[in-house]
């Protein structure tokens, strides 16, 4: 079994660094059967996913990852990655909390994002 924790950590660092600098460069991480659920809205396929990420209404963002948890997820070598953290958008001084879950599947000696679920986490009222 490969070191799923190391793979999850490397993936997470790459994903958020790329997201924060040039979201279009995330396209190779997805496939036509990949799905993103962004705040309850589903997007299927690379073009729709990257289109959604590029149309987000901000230019500058900084993800601050707090936790990365990973588990092997199936017999074919998939990895479930759960990330929590905070993000700063544009000139905001107060970070917003988020959680994001990725299902990584192996293909051609690498991994791609099969499932991606993003959710902002608001304080309890």
From Swiss-Prot:
Q: Which UniProt keywords apply?
A: Allergen, Cytoplasm, Protein transport, Transport
Query: Gene Ontology cellular component?
Result: cytoplasm
Where in the numbering of this chain does the NTF2 domain appear?
7-120
On whether Cytoplasm is a keyword of this UniProt record, the answer is yes
- Mind telling me which Gene3D superfamilies this protein's record contains? 3.10.450.50
Write out the function statement from the record. Facilitates protein transport into the nucleus. Could be part of a multicomponent system of cytosolic factors that assemble at the pore complex during nuclear import.
Q: What's the protein called, per UniProt?
A: Nuclear transport factor 2
Name the source organism: Davidiella tassiana
Q: Which gene encodes it?
A: NTF2
